[in-house]
Amino acid sequence: MKKSLFLIITTIFFFNINFSQDVTNNSFGKGLINVIAKDSSWKTKVAFRFQTRYEGNFDFRDSSYKDRAFVRRARIKGSGYAFSPKIKYKFEYDVHNGFVLDAVIKWNFTGNWTVWFGQTKLSGNIDRVFSSQKLQLVDRSLLNSKFTLDRDAGAQLRHHFTFGENFLVREIFSISQGEGLNQTVSSSGSDYTGRIELLPFGSFTKKGDYFAADLKREKTVKLMLSATYDYNENAMRSRGQKGSYINGDLSDLETLFLDAHLKYNGISFFGEYANRKTKNGSAVVDATYDIAGDIIAVNESYYTGSSLNLQMGYLLKNNWEIAARLTQVNPERITLNNDIKQYTLGFSRYVVGHNLKVQGDISLTEEASKKNKMMFRLQTEFNF
C-alpha cells in the first residue's frame, strides 16, 4: 500500500513540476487532465478529490464528548474511451486506504444495450448509487451502512427505452461474485441483481436522478421510481458484499430495495426501503441457548431485517441548502440486533456545485436498550 501511495504522490509531484506554467482551458471541477487523441481514437479525463471532516459525539449515558478531525475520503479517478466512444472505461483508486474501487469497461455493443465488465457499484439502493461526492448531507444513511450491496466484480447488462414522448424505462441486470471489493479467493456462489427504473416525466437535467439536491432547479417535476432485487448465493459475509466473514454454514441472502427520487424547483426528496432475509435456514449461524432452547446470545449471524430512509431538502436562491433525514432500522428479532432510529438535520453551502462545498449536520440516534447519542459533523468537499 505504501509503495502505491508513493507512486501516486510522485506522479502528481512531477506532473505539477512539468506543467506548472501551463495554462489550461479546464474549469474547476472539470478534471485535472482532459486529453483527446488527434485522431479521436482515445480520450481520458483524470480528476482528484478529497473530503476533510470534523466529527463530535456526545453520549447521554455518561455525558462524555469525544471528537476527531480526519480525512474521510481521498480519491483519484479516471474515465474516457478507447478505440471508439462506444467503448468507455472508469477507474477509481482510494488513495486514503490504498485499494482499487472501480475498474470497469463499458461497451455499447448495439442500440440502447451496454455491457459492463469489471469491478464497480451494483445497482442497489439509490443513496449508494449517488457518488459520495454528490451527497446532500455529510454522509449516507444507516440504511445504506446496514443493507447496501456496495461494489462487486462481474458483468452488468444495461438497457433503456422510452414510451411515447417522455416515459423513460431503464433496466439493469448483473452477475457478480458476491463477496464485494478486491476479493482474491474463489467465490462460494454467485450474486444476481436486477433493477428497473421508471421515469414517467423524462430524464432529470444533467443526470440529476443520480445526485442529491436539486442543483439544476428542475423547471418541471422529475420523478424516478425504482426497484432492485438481489440474490446472493452462499453468502460468505454477514451483509452480503460487506460485513464479517461467516465461519459456519452458509446461507443464501435475498435483498429487496424500493426507492423514489423527486426534484422540482429547488425541492428534492428521496425515500428508500430495504429488506434482507436468508432464503434457506435461519439468519443465526451460531448461538448460545438456555435449557428451554431459547437463544440468550448470538455469536454469529447474518444481518437481516428491514430499514426505511426518508430525506428531503430545499435549495435557496443563494445556494445554501437545508435538509433533513429520518432513518429507521429494524433487524430481524432472532439476531438480537437492536432497533435504531436516527434523526438528522443538515445544511450545505454549494460554492461550485458538488465540486466545492461545505456541509454540516447534527444527528440524534436512538438505539433500543442504549442511551441516546448526539453526533455533529462538519465537512468540506474539494474536487478538481
Sequence positions of predicted segments:
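Outer-membrane beta-barrel biogenesis signature
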Residues: 19-46, 203-222, 352-356, 371
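Outer membrane beta-barrel
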Residues: 31-181, 185-202, 221-224, 308-316, ...
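Detector for outer-membrane/organellar transmembrane beta-barrel domains
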Residues: 187, 197, 206-331
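Short sequence motifs at beta-strands and strand-loop junctions characteristic
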Residues: 25-27, 67-70, 95-97, 146-149, ...
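Outer-membrane beta-barrel translocator domains and adjoining extracellular loop/strand segments
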Residues: 58-64, 96, 100-104, 129-132, ...
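Bacterial Sec-dependent N-terminal signal peptides
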Residues: 1-23, 384
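Outer-membrane beta-barrel "beta-signal"
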Residues: 192-203, 347-349, 356, 371-384
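Outer-membrane beta-barrel domain signature
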Residues: 22-23, 35, 62-66, 91-92, ...
